UniProtKB/Swiss-Prot annotation:
Cross-referenced Gene3D superfamilies: Cyclophilin-like
UniProt subunit comment: Monomer.
A molecular function GO annotation: peptidyl-prolyl cis-trans isomerase activity
EC number assigned by the record: 5.2.1.8
Protein name: Peptidyl-prolyl cis-trans isomerase, microsomal
Protein's organism: Zea mays (Maize)
Length: 30
C-alpha cells in the first residue's frame, strides 16, 4: 500500500518579476 501523502515528483517554477527573482513555486505531483 502506497502512502498517499508521499510526493513522488516535484516541479519547480522560478518566478521572476521585472527580471528579478521573486521566489520559487513548488508543486507536488502525485
Amino acid at each position: 500500500k502506497k502512502d498517499l501523502t508521499e510526493v513522488t515528483h516535484k516541479v519547480y517554477f522560478d518566478v521572476e518579476i521585472d527580471g528579478k527573482p521573486a521566489g520559487r513555486i513548488v508543486m507536488g505531483l502525485f
